[in-house]
Amino acid sequence: MTLQKKIIELLGVKPAIIPEIEIKNCVDFLKKYLVNHVHIKSLIVGVSGGQDSTLTAKLCQMTAETLRKEKNDITYQFIALRLPYGIQYDEKDCQDAIRFIQPDQIFNVNIKKAVLSSEKSLKKSGVIISDYVRGNEKARERMKVQYSVAAMKQGLVVGTGHAAENITGFFTKYGDSGTDINPIAKLNKRQIRLLLKNLNCPKHLYLKKPMADLEDEHPQQDDESVLGVTYDVIDSYLEQKKIDIRSQKIIEALYLNTLHKRNLPITQ
C-alpha cells in the first residue's frame, strides 16, 4: 500500500461527496453523541470568521435546534465564542459569519492580555519566546477559554479541524487540536466549501483565503504560503488523484514530520 492510500484510509476522506448527505451525517453524529451523554447540553465553537469554524458552528447550531425540537428540551444550546487577540483585522468577516450562523449565545473574550501576561511571566523567569511560539500560545489560550466556558455550561468543545489540516499537521498541538469532538475531520477544504455553499453561506466567506493569523510578525499570512503547497493540490491528493511529484513530496514530508501531533503521548 502506498503512503498516499494509507493516509487516505487513516483520515477517511471520500473522493466525492453529496453535500446534503454530509451535512445530515455531521448533524446526526453530533446529535447521537449528545443523546448518549445526557449531561451535555451545549456545543462550544470558537468562531473566527474562517471557513472551518463557520461551517462547524453552523452544524452545531443546526444540531441544537434539531434536538430542542425532537426532544422538546430547550436546554440544548449552541455557544459561539469570539476570541480575538487585540484587534481582529477581518472583524467584518467574523460578524458576517455570526449573522449566518445565528448562534443561541455569544461570548466575547479578548485573549491578548492573558497571552502577554504569560509571556511576561516567562520573560521574568529568563525564557524569551519567539513570535512563532507566541502564536501557539494564542491557540492554546483560545482553547483554554473554550474549556472554561464548556465546564460552566455543561458543554462540549467542538473542533474545527479537517483532513487537509490533519495531513499537513497545520494546527497547534494542545491548541486548536485539543477538542472533545470533531464533526468535519473527514472533509477536505473543497468539500468544506461545498457544504457552506449548500447551506447558503455568504460567498465571500466560503471563498475566503485560509489563514491562521497567529504570528504578529506575519499578519494575515495565508496558509498556503506557509505550507508551500495549495489546498487544491492537497485536496486532490486526499481524493487519490495524481498530483505533481514535487507537491506529493511536500505533502508526505509534512505528514511524516508531524506524526507526533496526531499521536497520543508517548508512554513506556
UniProtKB/Swiss-Prot annotation:
Gene3D superfamilies in UniProt: HUPs
Please state what class of enzyme this protein is: ligase
Q: Reaction(s) catalyzed by this protein? A: deamido-NAD(+) + NH4(+) + ATP = AMP + diphosphate + NAD(+) + H(+)
Q: Which residues bind Mg(2+)?
A: 52, 165
Q: Which UniProt keywords apply?
A: ATP-binding, Ligase, Magnesium, Metal-binding, NAD, Nucleotide-binding
Q: What is its EC number?
A: 6.3.1.5
GO cellular component: a single term: cytoplasm
Q: Give GO terms: molecular function aspect only.
A: ATP binding; glutaminase activity; metal ion binding; NAD+ synthase (glutamine-hydrolyzing) activity; NAD+ synthase activity
| Residues where ATP binds | 46-53, 160, 189
The keyword Lyase belongs to this UniProt entry's keyword annotation:
no
Q: Which GO terms describe its biological process?
A: NAD biosynthetic process
Q: Which Pfam families does UniProt cross-reference here?
A: NAD_synthase
Highest taxon of source: Bacteria
Q: Summarize where deamido-NAD(+) binds, as residue positions.
A: 140, 173, 180, 260-261
- From the UniProt record, give the pathway where this protein acts: Cofactor biosynthesis; NAD(+) biosynthesis; NAD(+) from deamido-NAD(+) (ammonia route): step 1/1
Keyword Ribosomal protein among UniProt keywords: no
Function, please?
A: Catalyzes the ATP-dependent amidation of deamido-NAD to form NAD. Uses ammonia as a nitrogen source.
NCBIfam families per the record? nadE, PRK00768.1
Q: Which family does it belong to?
A: Belongs to the NAD synthetase family.
Query: What is the name of this protein?
Result: NH(3)-dependent NAD(+) synthetase
Q: Which organism is it from?
A: Buchnera aphidicola subsp. Acyrthosiphon pisum (strain Tuc7)
**Gene expressing this chain:** nadE
